[in-house]
């Protein structure tokens, strides 16, 4: 009796790849768990704490408030922007707006802060316009809650816009015709036509954005403005770096871990929902074909598009204009600049290749499980365990991870190497969810396409990978490497804890310039960082899959 197809196609991969994936998952979870335990253990054993219960309550309250309003404003602006974008007939205009707003997805947080300061800050474009019009009364202060909300909307409103716009694209034409025929508008149109197509993605999307805002660090650190606008993550950073108050850090970390784990469990409830609405269907059908444009609608469109211009597009323009100045030549003459860039590039390359390697093993393991239609309980358990190892970093503050590993390894690793190791580990954990999602769908596709052929030809193990899988996935590996390199180059979280004059990265150099109010120098370094990210992305894409760069 011939063996089943599953036995033939899986036996060459299951043993080795699944074991490697399981080992990596155990290592990641154990490392994060031990780092948390070491911080909590050291913290709760300490006797002194600078923060009172009232201080901790205020910090938690502000963290919730800024996260809630950030999600609400991003959702509102994203939804209205998607409706207006879908109303506009010009395909070219749609592509330009989507392209410009999508830059925020890969823009480092420190770079975005520079752009917002150049527009909304004390010497920004809007301040100069107010002065010229004698409107300098009741001036808004960028630093504080307003700046935090502005920065979070800068990053998250384009995400909501893209998702909602894709949802609107799959609304059947008949729905729009019938709505126009029966004069269904306003709230009724939203309830009957739009809501059924966005309700499945909304809880998951809001949960992810809330988690990002709740654990935000770089934006709060640079735009918070003081103790009155401090979140849990920044409070942990302050307690550890400036006061070395491990007890307060442990208490704050416990609250943050508990809240984030609850949110992750909430997300897991909706992870089984169908999210095909996230897939783009290029259908440039417009509501304008079926409803009349009025003066009121035109005013609403103008206001929303103006908000997008002031919050997202104008900061990008101001950053480029201010960064590409004579200051950039002074920075390039400084030898320390090259050392900082080499440090960042070295860490980004190492982190990217480690991340993509781990992602491939994990993706193949998950593909093995998906391809087995008769999954056993142990397969489901392994999949959940691997998913936990990928997503756990979202719940763990980077400062907690760095501090815990420092306490755990300070007797075993020299401090000269410690920042490098922590940066690489945190970058891998940061990039892993994105890299796995990029690679996994292609792994499953190749398994379904080539498994029978490889079984008949006897291609197994590394022979199959070199001959079949790698050539077909070069573009995916290039995309993943480029994205991981960009994310690694722009991360400020861990280096903010361990950065010093002896070891610096590009985000830390930008933060140092901003701390001394040298905004023009910070803008110039930010432009160099953007150029470096772009070159990395193009290099990896061209090197591995030039035919598929656009994909």
Feature-to-residue mapping (PLM):
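Short juxtamembrane loops and helix-capping segments at transmembrane helix boundaries
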Residues: 46-51, 127-139, 230-239, 326-336, ...
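Flexible interhelical linker loops that connect adjacent transmembrane helices
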Residues: 270-304
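Short, Lys/Arg-rich, polar N-terminal cytosolic tail immediately upstream
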Residues: 1-14
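Solenoid-repeat scaffolds in large eukaryotic assemblies
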Residues: 179, 248-249, 454, 521-523
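Short cytosolic juxtamembrane segments of multi-pass membrane proteins
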Residues: 3, 275-289, 369-377, 459, ...
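Glycine-rich helix-loop "coupling/hinge" segments at transmembrane-helix boundaries
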Residues: 218-244, 492-519
